[in-house]
C-alpha cells in the first residue's frame, strides 16, 4: 500500500522543510545509465509547486545515488515544445526554470520530456504527477515482462535457438 508506506516513511524520516508532499521515486535502467522518476503514485493530483518539488527531490536523490553534480531535470509531457503540456506542467516548468537559474541551483532544467525519451539518456530526473507516473511504472513493468516472455519463447523455440541461447547466456 503506497499510502501506508509513505506515511511510515514520513513518520521516521520527516519531510524536507520546503517540500509540501513527498513523492514516490523509482530509478529505471537505461542503456548507458539510469533515469530517476518522481512521483510514481503518492499524489494522484498535485499543484505546480508540488510537481516542481518532485523535480528537485528527484535531483537530490539522483545526486546521492549516482553522484551526478548537476542532474538534468525534465517534466513528463506529451511533447517537447513549450506550448505542449497542461496548465499544471507549464506552470511547473516555469517554476523549475526559475529554480535552475538561481545561482545556488544544483540541477539543470531541460524542459519537457516525452514518454519516448525517458530511456534515451538525455534526462537524469523526470518529474510527473503520481497518476501519470504510476501509469508509466505499470506500463514499463508490463513491457519488460512481455519482452522477457517473447525472448524466452524465441530462445526455446527449437534446437538451434536453444544453442544460441546457451551461447548468449553469459551476456544476458
Say what each PLM segment does.
Residues 1-15, 20-52, 63, 72, ...:
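N-terminal loops that bind phosphate or other acidic moieties
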Residues 3-6, 81-84, 117-120, 134:
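Short, active-site-adjacent cap segments at secondary-structure transitions
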Residues 7-10, 25, 52-59, 63, ...:
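Predominant activation on well-ordered alpha-helical scaffold segments within soluble catalytic domains
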Residues 9-33, 122-126, 130-172:
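Glycine-rich phosphate/nucleotide-binding loop
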Residues 26, 115-116:
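Short, flexible, glycine/charge-rich loop motifs used to bind or transfer phosphoryl groups or to couple energy/partner
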Residues 35-37, 109, 127:
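Conserved beta-strand scaffold positions in the cores of enzyme catalytic domains, especially
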Residues 44-115, 124:
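Glycine-rich phosphate/diphosphate-binding loop of Rossmann-like nucleotide-binding domains
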Amino acid at each position: 500500500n503506497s499510502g501506508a508506506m509513505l506515511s511510515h516513511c514520513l513518520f521516521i524520516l520527516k519531510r524536507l522543510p520546503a517540500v509540501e508532499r513527498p513523492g514516490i521515486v523509482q530509478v529505471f535502467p537505461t542503456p548507458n545509465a539510469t533515469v530517476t522518476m518522481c512521483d510514481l503514485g503518492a499524489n494522484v493530483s498535485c499543484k505546480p509547486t508540488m510537481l516542481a518539488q518532485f523535480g528537485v527531490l528527484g535531483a537530490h536523490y539522483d545526486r546521492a545515488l549516482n553522484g551526478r553534480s548537476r542532474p538534468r531535470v525534465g517534466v513528463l509531457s506529451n511533447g517537447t515544445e513549450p506550448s505542449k503540456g497542461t496548465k499544471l506542467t507549464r506552470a511547473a516548468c516555469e517554476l523549475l526554470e526559475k529554480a535552475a537559474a538561481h545561482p545556488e541551483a544544483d540541477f539543470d532544467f531541460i524542459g519537457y520530456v516525452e514518454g519516448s525519451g525517458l530511456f534515451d539518456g538525455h534526462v537524469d530526473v523526470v518529474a510527473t504527477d503520481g497518476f501519470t507516473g504510476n501509469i508509466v511504472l505499470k506500463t514499463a513493468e508490463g513491457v519488460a515482462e512481455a519482452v522477457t516472455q517473447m525472448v524466452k519463447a524465441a530462445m526455446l523455440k527449437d534446437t538451434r535457438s536453444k544453442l544460441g541461447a546457451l551461447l548468449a547466456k553469459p551476456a544476458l
